[in-house]
Amino acid sequence: MEHKSKRNFRITGALGLLFAAFTAIVATVDVSPIGPEQSSVGLAALNRFAAGLLGVNPLWYDITEWLGAVAVLSALGFAALGLCQLIRRRSLLKVDPRILLLGAFYIAVALVYLFFERVIINYRPVILDAGLEASYPSSHTVIAICIFGTAIMQFHHYLRGKTVWLVIMDSVTALLMAVTVIGRLLSGVHWFTDIAGGVLLSSALIMLYASAVSYVECRKKV
């Protein structure tokens, strides 16, 4: 278990460095004013090609907006589970560590979102409301992968031995995650690199959560 924990942390670090390197490339390589209001976009040739190929699809935008709400409701469900455990067990220390870590994980995801709202790498390829909006990394991609991905981890813990339910929940959750990410790309409200950056970032964050859970469980067995 200790070896697994160390391996997970190494993978987390590698994914984090990969995201940082990709972000640096997007911010500095082939930057051209191809966005709305002449906003500059990195890897402009690639992003222009993908945007021209996919166009803008309002239906997929609406679908992914609803799926984003489903992801948030899923997170609230696990928050409610933690609250129920706290009420029943009457001590924060008796709440399942993986649920406490999940709460910290959600906070970390929110902080990352706020950071990239301030530190803008790319603006959206379309203007949706009032003016330019931050687009990198795709927040819906990050939310979908982070929330649905960690939800699958909880199912594998709390539904152990219930094979049918586990298969159903895994399949539905993985489908929701995939449709959200692919649908967000097809919607045309993000550049291709926004989606790719979101996938890399959320992969690093999920591995960080998995590493923390593995570490805590390893410590408990010592």
Place the predicted regions along the sequence by residue.
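N-terminal transmembrane-helix/juxtamembrane module of multi-pass inner/ER membrane proteins
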Residues: 1-74, 117-129
